[in-house]
Amino acid sequence: MDEMSCGGGGGGARWKRARVAGMGEGKAGGGGGAAFLGLERVGMVVRMLPVPEKVSARARVVRGSLVAHFRGWRVVRETWWWVLLLWILAGSLGSFYLFLFMNAQSLDKRRDSLASMCDERARMLQDQFNVSMNHLQALAILVSTFHHSKTPSAIDQMTFARYAERTAFERPLTSGVAYAVRVTHGEREQFERQQGWAIKKMYSSSNKKQSSPGPGPGDAAVAEIREPAEEYAPVIFAQDAYKHVISFDMLSGNEDRDNILRARKSGKGVLTAPFKLLNNRLGVILTYTVYKYELPAYARPHERIQAAIGYLGGIFDIQALVEKLLKQLASQESIMVNVYDTTNESPISMYGDDTGSGMCHVSVLNFGDPSRKHEMHCRFEKKPPWPWLAITSSFGTLVIALLTGHIFQATVHRIAKVEDDFHKMSELKKRAEDADVAKSQFLATVSHEIRTPMNGVLGMLQMLMDTDLDTTQQDYVRTAQASGKALVSLINEVLDQAKIESGKLELETVPFDLRTVCDDILSLFCGKAQEKGLELAVYVSDQVPQILIGDPGRIRQIITNLVGNSIKFTERGHIYLTVHVVEEVMSCLEVETGIQNTNTLSGYPVANRRCSWESIRLFNRELHSSEKSFAPIASDSISLVISVEDTGVGIPFEAQSRVFTPFMQVGPSIARIHGGTGIGLSISKCLVGLMKGEIGFASKPHVGSTFTFTAVLMRAHCKGNDIKSSEFKGINALVVDHRPVRAKVTKYHLQRLGVKTELTAELNQFISKLNSGSLTAKLVLIDKETWLKESHCTPLLVNKLRNNDKPDSPKLFLLGSSASSPKGGSDTSREHNLNVIMKPLRASMLQVSLRRALGGVDKVHCRNGVVGNSTLGSLLHKKQIIVVDDNIVNLKVAAGALKKYGAEVTCADSGKKAITLLKPPHNFDACFMDIQMPEMDGFEATRRIRVMERDLNERIERGEAPPECASIQRWRTPILAMTADVIQATHEECLKSEMDGYVSKPFEGEQLYSEVARFFQNHDQVE
């Protein structure tokens, strides 16, 4: 690493080591030539090294790379002066080209700026001109309406002049207006008699040249009587400034005559050529034709000529118009503007001086008359500035090129060091990757190996609990069980984190009942919630299908993690789990409501869950866009929104940004007080991502938190096991609870049982219905908090029910929890002899409670309740069961658990032995098969057993079965997979190997009962 330590011309420690080894004679650090000589000799020695015939391929690659490295180094050292010279030359040419390029860009930018300013002025000039044209056209319509369409006319010279003067602000660009009427030769005499004057013709004072608009002050016009003609256009109305043109025939001037003929033929406004106004400024006349009636747009020219009855003219001061425009658009960089009439070959200047040179831009003007052409020419008043940006940039480029050449030599000498560092880093990177793979494999292996004895420990502890223990010993065993389960949970989290980091975490796709999963989670935290006095509840929307397809284990893991955190950080109030579809949540987001955040499950304020739903907007848009692209695939998908709301301590604002960071907690005190590793939320976020969802939260310190995540699952086309029982169909129930959210939860669980439910908020309403005889409910469920709140009504209610001798009198239930049972309230049910249902509510637990109260038989299948030994004993008594596991401890635990329930157990320590024992015919009723065993795993053993059973069934069908199978129609032994990690035994693998289900190790009463009950009640061998 210290190659450059010897200084000089580039000789270094590397070459010094080569010389010491006898591979060079030059002195280290004695100059570039000596170093180069040593380097060349090293290359020669490398080339001359003998290559053994059996040398490894890696050694050949290393030797080849060394030879190539030394050769490339020598070539660079010999040619670097020429390279430097070429570099400087290229830098000089490049800087010159950069100057030309940037200067051209500057000119183009200046040209574009001029074009933009010129076009803007031209556009505004056209717009202002068009506005005045529109007002003139409106004045023409006014004359047609009130002069020609009224008899007698509503307009005279005084009215016209006054109106024109008072509306002059609408025509700021016109200096005057006049109206001439169309008179034929036959109408002339009568017209002159009506007007009181004769029609005159217009001449200019200089050589009788026609001018417009006629004689005026200062032009010495000669007024002569108009000679006879086919038709005339005498002016009858004019603005006061131009009333001297009244009685003059506008057709007597060539320019005006041509204007009028074009105007009435086209039906549009037409312009004259520029001429000098009375104030010696240039202007034009715009002429509009007035018609007898409104003509369609497609009218022909001869139809327009016949319908013409008059002509309205307006004089425009072009110079004033342009000057006003330039004042409005005064910019930082002024420009010179010239306006030309380019109708003829020789353009006529209408505004501006013709002087000026340099860059020029021409914008075409359109004043509405297609027969006349106008242009605006624009130039900058100032000369362009020096292109300092191009000069400095090109000079800077040249300086950079020289500096680059200056450091080129040092760069060449550092190439070797960089290459060495690169090879070392590559080797370290490979080692790090290998270490990461080894770490993941180690975690997976060690975690599994730890879980196996831990399952044995937990199983033995469970068996120890079934022995005769005193209270102290039971407490010790429960503590050991809790510690063991916590350790297994921690191991599972670490394993999940390792799988996530290695990208090997996969999800199952199996049918499951989400409502049952939620009930199981509530059962898991029921004890902790009651110990802390918390209200714990779940609500699943009716829009959520009963059976979904997804990974129930991972969904359970996410919800369990969120609810567990809420239990951990909540000391009062409630924890509320809700499940909706995305469409329901989106409708809530779009409609803002004024509901207070205290209208909650327990009445405590909560964090606004809308904040945690905001990410769902983006999720919903992405979901719909993907559904459009893959409509056939996404037709069965459903997007769920699952929220966990609590009234805990909340998350400090400064810690909210690192909530999902692995191994991060709010502070060190959290780990001391509540424990945990800080990876639960990180794992949950990764699992949500695998489900194509999003996760977010809203939290307010000292108020609470609401965590929300989305998941995309599939709809199941099969029907699930509906929990609704026929014994509750047609039964009505009344729920009395003053908290709407809590009443909604109770109604949800009752409806799952098929009970029609009505809600009321006060006991008085229930008593009123009871007194009036309008009560149809057979079941009345009153929340204990409401019962205590309205305790003044309870004696009356109890007496009323006791004195009611009717057989159909309602059954009264109190919904109680530790949260709603203050001191002294626990004796309420005992005092009044009431039925009590403890919360949190679950459908199965509620089913059992209602059945007992109604006098039904208490069935044993209770998923969330505690399954007694007698229940499993009735199923497993005298059953022949074989347990297959390669681990002796697991065999002992499984055998002990099954023997506890009266089963006769046979153990096998390998898959091959299981195949031998289960070769039909045999006397076993079921088999519990471990899926991870050496030589042959449980899946392969099961497949071979099924092959033997199929062969026997074919022989039975052909009548070739042995005598032992004479009374059996079809042989099939139930086989259940045993695993420490339920996720590994996926539903697809079980189906492929024809297994019938799975149980987790160690055995738990509830799960064991739910599995074996299916086989020993419905899938027994047919004898």
Curated annotation (Swiss-Prot):
Induction: Slightly induced by cis-zeatin (cZ) and dihydrozeatin (DHZ). GO terms for cellular component: nucleus; plasma membrane. Its EC number is 2.7.13.3. Its main location: membrane. One of its GO terms (molecular function) is phosphorelay sensor kinase activity. The chain crosses the membrane at residues 81-101, 388-408. Residues 1-80, 409-1023 are cytoplasmic. Highly expressed in young leaves and at lower levels in roots, mature leaves, stems and spikelets. InterPro entries: 2C_system_His_kinase, CHASE_dom, CHASE_sf, CheY-like_superfamily, HATPase_C_sf, His_kinase_dom, HisK_dim/P_dom, HisK_dim/P_sf. Residues 445-715 form the Histidine kinase domain. It is a multi-pass membrane protein. Residues 732-854, 880-1016 form the Response regulatory domain. Residues 817-827 have a biased composition (Polar residues). It holds the Pfam family HATPase_c. It is found in: Cell membrane. Activation probably requires a transfer of a phosphate group between a His in the transmitter domain and an Asp of the receiver domain. GO terms for biological process: cellular response to abscisic acid stimulus; cellular response to cold; cellular response to phosphate starvation; cellular response to sucrose stimulus; cytokinin-activated signaling pathway; defense response to bacterium; leaf senescence; negative regulation of iron ion transport. PANTHER family: HISTIDINE KINASE 3, TWO-COMPONENT HISTIDINE KINASE. This is Probable histidine kinase 3. It comes from Oryza sativa subsp. japonica.
